[in-house]
Amino acid sequence: MAEEQKTSKVDVESPAVLAPAKEPTPAPVEVADEKIHNPPPVESKALAVVEKPIEEHTPKKASSGSADRDVILADLEKEKKTSFIKAWEESEKSKAENRAQKKISDVHAWENSKKAAVEAQLRKIEEKLEKKKAQYGEKMKNKVAAIHKLAEEKRAMVEAKKGEELLKAEEMGAKYRATGVVPKATCGCF
């Protein structure tokens, strides 16, 4: 008899606990689905307009606590997904920005190294040109010195010849004076 009372108590208690939980749960989900899925108007066939479903915020009823909880959990899950997607999007944007910045940095480094190489090449060419200029300058100075030396030698020869001619003229003049002979004119005009 005690077992029958326990089973009857269990039978009485279990439907009372389970019955309210089963009935409110399907109703709010169906209502929420009906609110979210609005059929597009017939006129929208002509226009390609994308409409976001408008969620109507109705005051929540105090009597259906389980339904409110389901709606809140659904909203919370939706917000969680949205925030995750937004965080992912921001992360991807940040990664893309970092990759682009790194590539730009690499391009700057490449440009700077190439510029430095070209400038080094230019300096090397300038040094070679300076050396050649110095060498040619030295050669030209040597040529000028050689020309000056030759000119001095030629001047010396001219001076020597002049001295010889003067000496010869003096000797001839002395000879003509001593002999009393008048020299012949060297010019054939007279």
Curated annotation (Swiss-Prot):
Gene Ontology terms, cellular component aspect? cytosol; plasma membrane; plasmodesma
Q: Which GO terms describe its biological process?
A: defense response to virus; membrane raft localization; response to salicylic acid
InterPro entries in the record, alphabetically? Remorin_C (IPR005516), Remorin_N (IPR005518)
Question: Compositional bias of type Basic and acidic residues: which residue ranges?
Answer: 1-12
What keywords sit in the KW lines? Coiled coil, Phosphoprotein
Tissues showing expression: Expressed in roots, leaves, stems, flowers and siliques, with a maximal expression in apical regions.
Phosphothreonine carried by residues? 58
Q: Which residues form a coiled coil?
A: 92-147
Inducers of expression: 10-fold by auxin, 2-fold by gibberellic acid and not by cytokinin.
Pfam families given in the database record: Remorin_C, Remorin_N
**Region Disordered, annotated ranges:** 1-45, 50-69
Residues that bear Phosphoserine: 14
| Subunit structure as annotated in this protein's UniProt entry | May polymerize to form filamentous structures.
Function per UniProt? Exhibits a non sequence-specific DNA-binding activity.
Record family assignment = Belongs to the remorin family.
Q: What is this protein called in UniProt?
A: Remorin
* Source species: Arabidopsis thaliana
Taxonomic lineage: Eukaryota, Viridiplantae, Streptophyta, Embryophyta, Tracheophyta
